[in-house]
């Protein structure tokens, strides 16, 4: 669980504003999560998350004060790009980043909730499929969906996944799950706040890739 426990997200303030710098610093450590899934077919999601973090950081670094929060980024870019917004800039990068982060959240929550294939309880295919269905599938065309369906069958055993997530540390499954639950508290609240922000600002897009 070391991979997640070392980089917990900050609790949200009352106004649910997410500070850009600390957010990017925390999520920058998440792409290796996909290495724990074993299959190289998950590499595109990993690369997508890394690439979108880089794009948002490039905008943030131009003026950290102006782009102090994620909402600041959307508001400034809305005024800057006009009719092209929200399909441009860091707004578009964050749109896709939140989907990749939601995949991780739904997947981990499903494992913590004990959802599984009763005939194959040590497989994480059920969890990965739920995460894909909820976070990414509707934004993928037929070909990409087919590729990911194949990837789900290559997902590792739960025991191997948790061991990889723990970076080889000798911890029990329950200890690992407890650390995942701790990680998910602020992580889930943050992802929910980003989704709500996109809805309120009418910045959500439904096109497929």
Swiss-Prot record:
Q: Which Pfam families does this chain map to?
A: GLTP
Name of encoding gene: Gltp
The UniProt keyword set, sorted, is: Acetylation, Cytoplasm, Lipid transport, Repeat, Transport
Taxonomy, top ranks, is: Eukaryota, Metazoa, Chordata, Craniata, Vertebrata
Q: What is this protein called?
A: Glycolipid transfer protein
Renumbered ranges of sequence repeats: 45-55, 56-66
Name the family: Belongs to the GLTP family.
- Name positions with the PTM N-acetylalanine: 2
An annotated GO BP: response to immobilization stress
Which GO molecular function entries does the Swiss-Prot or TrEMBL record give?
glycolipid binding; identical protein binding; lipid binding; lipid transfer activity
Localization, per the record, is:
Cytoplasm
Q: Where does beta-D-galactosyl-(1->4)-beta-D-glucosyl-(1<->1)-N-[(9Z)-octadecenoyl]-sphing-4-enine bind?
A: 48-55, 140, 207
